[in-house]
Amino acid sequence: MSKIIGIDLGTTNSCVAIMDGKTPKVIENAEGARTTPSVVAFLEDGERLVGQPAKRQAVTNPTNTLFAIKRLIGRNFADPVVAKDKAMVPYEIVKGPTGDAWVKAHGKDYSPQEVSAFILQKMKEAAESHLGEPVTKAVITVPAYFNDAQRQATKDAGKIAGLEVLRIINEPTAAALAYGLEMNEGKKIAVYDLGGGTFDVSVLEIGDGVFEVKSTNGDTFLGGEDFDLRIVDYLADEFKKEQGVDLRKDKLALQRLREEAEKAKKELSSTAQYEVNLPFISMNASGPLHLNIKLSRSKLEALVEDLITRTIGPCEQALKDAGLKKSDIDEVILVGGMSRMPKVQQAVQDFFGREPHKGVNPDEVVALGAAVQAGVLQGDVKDVLLLDVTPLTLGIETLGGVFTPLIERNTTIPTKRSQTFSTADDNQSAVTIRAFQGERPMAVDNKFLGQFDLQGIPPAPRGVPQIEVTFDIDANGIVNVHAKDKATNKEHSIRIQANGGLSDADIERMVKEAEANKASDEKKKALVEAKNQGEAIVHSTEKAFAEHGDKIGGAEKTAIETGLTDLKAALEGEDVEAIQAKTQALIQASMKLGEAMYGAQQGADGGEEAAHDDGVVDAEFEEVDDSKPSA
């Protein structure tokens, strides 16, 4: 059975891990790094870059370099948070075929699921390279506060990448799994997870292998990217005051600002001041303009103070929902790159009244937890029971547009709940079931999940028909809805498909495109390797031919010259098999040349040995018998 891998698909960085015996272990990527930037770039010639290579070229190719794509996954184009993102990224966010947010690169539209799949493929390839076998199954993490549409979209991304997603697991829960794997005594812990694009807080009770999530809360549009944007705005405003030029209108300058903002934010976690220095950032009539601004830690803290404060409300709500006081929490675990910021750590300490635990790597702990869950599913990890919850209330729209809950938030999953409803009008023959997710009293203010019709209800006065509606949430947090007319036993059920989500046909097409791209990428790689080998053989043969060509016969010389000409011609083209064949032909033709070189070397060595014979001393050796006693 092939290994199940654990993947943390992050907004800024992603990470992959496996169970190595009883211990989860992070796998390094092709560049030798333990985390991979969640960045995808498309070049002019159609080549696609993923991870660090994509991030490195972002400044010179800002409109075709896609990052923070997780903030768009499962979101409608009309969503206000998408409009906010649209104004702040150099690439184009467009309306997809079904109204959801897509992105454009080199004139082609991509769904966030497809872009996420490119990142997942990179993780999959790293695992396959490490394990030396194909990988087809994975556990993928998502923010605890992701709704059904976002969870389904993440699962679809896995499918496009060629992975069967066995489980979607919440990021704070995964972190708790990694933290508490060896823990025997009972503890109540809070996981504060401030990542690149999302914030979650979960309260759990752990001990004796049981991980029970008591509550979860968060904000799926609050993270390190927002901190970066505050720095970008500050730098752009200061530059505009001094030079009268708004750098936000220049996509290349904006990308340089973003990169420098991220660097400044990281540096200011360990230093008191950072000098932002961007020469030739813009031009005016007088010539080039340079940006040079000193940014202090205190200034950064002032810029982002309200963002940090926004994380405290969900912490209060999570404690309230869990029925716990701050003093009941035994440990606070910090997760996500932004939790390294001293001001964030101080805010957490001030709220919970205890110093947070810093013994886990905030960039890797989520992937490690995903690997633990993978180990549980594989049967390698015993005696671990994970009881997670649904983050948002689920219900349907009833008369007057009211949101009627069926499953309250923080209900342990998997779960199933039923409730009986009736018709609103006399002789109504069909009802439309409209499912929503959220906490607002009116349905329209919550996240619309989907709808279906239950037809063929017998004519009856309003209020008489009995229609049973059942919500079913699986262990991934994905919703199914079922409606049944009790009089006729007619029923209808659907797996909720996000309004604007990918259809099965879309996913199938994207899977095929991903496979085709993989084949194309492998072909390009094979061509590069064949050309490298061919060019190396040409170089070494020409060098040897120049030095030792006079030591071989005319027929061998002709064969080598022909071989060189043929291989050089093949190297001009892109036929891998032709290059490989001509390379082998030249290797065969130059074997006599190799013998001549070897003979010349032997002769040189022989002369050297003769020269040293004068210094050789003859000696007699006695064979030692180990059985004889030593003196």
Swiss-Prot record:
The keyword Lyase does not apply. One of its GO terms (molecular function) is ATP binding. SUPFAM superfamilies: Actin-like ATPase domain, Heat shock protein 70kD (HSP70), C-terminal subdomain, Heat shock protein 70kD (HSP70), peptide-binding domain. The modification Phosphothreonine is found at residue 198. It comes from the Bacteria. Keywords: ATP-binding, Chaperone, Nucleotide-binding, Phosphoprotein, Stress response. PROSITE patterns: HSP70_1, HSP70_2, HSP70_3. Induction: By stress conditions e.g. heat shock. Acts as a chaperone. Belongs to the heat shock protein 70 family. PANTHER family: HEAT SHOCK PROTEIN 70KDA. This is Chaperone protein DnaK. It comes from Caulobacter sp. (strain K31).
